[in-house]
């Protein structure tokens, strides 16, 4: 039997649904709305296996903040009513047949990346449901990303139009430009246009840095800020080697569970 694993970036979905609710304390409405959303996802995707991956709301900013102290320093905290409602949300999702994986020390992004690439590398189909373009570096013939809210696929044509580079170059791209929303600085003076020019000529940051053909205006910037570029690339790259502690059989989709 062919496999189709759907991985839901849980808080990415929940926080968007919750922020659109007229009453932020009405978690019951958030549960109902996310439930309808999940029903549509299940209907459209027809998964054989499915899991929702959550960041732990109490954890720190993980290993990335250890090497880049400002990483996500300014991110908005989760609303208190939503924090208190997470257990109820996870229970409601479980009743729909979707189990939850809660990160402990690792960012949810890395857990998603590890599971997705592990399954996709065996030629099985994987769909990540998220608006987070960071996952696009994982794109492969068997791994796709679905932006549910914009009703679009974050695929190679989208990446080409949005960034002008290949999916495999995205970590290098962000190493150069930085990621302002996560307080990742990149290389001062290198914006999207410059990063695209560099990565059109060279495969990655190291190839550009090592080449005598790099144009002088970019040579000066990389000479002065190569360590920042390397560090920011490392932060932008997703880890795909985390010990998950479960196997596919544990997340087979068999339909709704009985309420406990």
Swiss-Prot record:
Q: Where is the 5'-3' exonuclease domain?
A: 165-259
UniProt: K(+) binding residues: 176, 185, 187, 190
Question: Which terms does the UniProt entry file under GO BP?
Answer: DNA replication, Okazaki fragment processing
This entry's comment on the bound cofactor is: Binds 2 Mg(2+) per subunit. Only one magnesium ion has a direct interaction with the protein, the other interactions are indirect.
Q: Report whether Metal-binding shows up as a keyword of the record.
A: yes
Which Gene3D superfamilies does the record associate with it? 5' to 3' exonuclease, C-terminal subdomain, 5'-nuclease
- Residues reported in the UniProt entry to bind Mg(2+): 109
Instruction: Show the segment(s) annotated as Interaction with DNA.
Output: 189-194
Q: Which InterPro entries match?
A: 5-3_exonucl_a-hlix_arch_N, 5-3_exonuclease, 5-3_exonuclease_C_sf, DNA_polI_H3TH, FEN, HhH2, PIN-like_dom_sf, Xni
The lineage's top-level taxon is Bacteria
Cofactor(s) recorded in Swiss-Prot or TrEMBL: Mg(2+); K(+)
Keyword Nuclease attributed: yes
UniProt keywords, alphabetically: DNA-binding, Endonuclease, Hydrolase, Magnesium, Metal-binding, Nuclease, Potassium
User: Sorted alphabetically, which SMART domains does this protein's record hold?
Assistant: 53EXOc, HhH2
Q: EC number(s) in its UniProt entry?
A: 3.1.-.-
Q: GO: which molecular function terms?
A: 5'-3' exonuclease activity; 5'-flap endonuclease activity; DNA binding; magnesium ion binding; potassium ion binding
| Free-text function comment from the UniProt entry | Has flap endonuclease activity. During DNA replication, flap endonucleases cleave the 5'-overhanging flap structure that is generated by displacement synthesis when DNA polymerase encounters the 5'-end of a downstream Okazaki fragment.
Please report which protein family the annotation says this sequence is part of.
Answer: Belongs to the Xni family.
Q: Which HAMAP family match?
A: Xni
Sorted alphabetically, which NCBIfam families does this protein's record hold?
A: PRK09482.1
User: Know the name of this protein?
Assistant: Flap endonuclease Xni
Say which species the protein is native to.
Answer: Vibrio campbellii (strain ATCC BAA-1116)
- Name of encoding gene: xni
């Amino acid at each position: 039997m062919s496999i189709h694993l759907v991985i839901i970036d849980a808080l990415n979905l929940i926080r968007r649904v919750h922020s659109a609710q007229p009453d932020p304390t009405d978690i019951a409405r958030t549960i109902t709305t996310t439930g309808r959303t999940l029903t549509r996802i299940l209907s459209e995707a027809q998964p054989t296996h499915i899991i929702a991956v959550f960041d732990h709301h109490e954890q720190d900013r993980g290993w990335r903040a250890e090497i880049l102290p400002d990483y996500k320093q300014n991110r908005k905290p989760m609303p208190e009513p939503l924090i208190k409602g997470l257990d109820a949300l996870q229970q409601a999702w479980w009743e729909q047949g979707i189990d939850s994986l809660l990160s402990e020390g690792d960012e949810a992004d890395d857990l998603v990346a590890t599971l997705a690439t592990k399954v996709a590398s065996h030629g099985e189909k994987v769909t990540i449901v998220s608006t987070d373009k960071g996952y696009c570096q994982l794109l492969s013939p068997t791994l796709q990303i679905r932006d549910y809210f914009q009703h679009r696929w974050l695929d190679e044509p989208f990446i080409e139009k949005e960034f002008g580079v290949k999916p495999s170059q995205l970590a290098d791209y962000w190493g150069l430009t930085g990621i302002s929303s996560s307080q990742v600085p990149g290389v001062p003076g290198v914006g999207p246009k410059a990063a695209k020019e560099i990565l059109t000529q060279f495969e990655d940051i190291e190839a550009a840095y090592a080449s005598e053909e790099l144009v002088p205006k970019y040579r000066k910037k990389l000479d002065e800020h190569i360590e920042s570029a390397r560090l920011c690339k490392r932060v932008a790259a997703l880890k795909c080697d985390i010990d998950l502690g479960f196997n596919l059989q544990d997340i087979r989709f068999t339909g709704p569970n009985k309420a406990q």
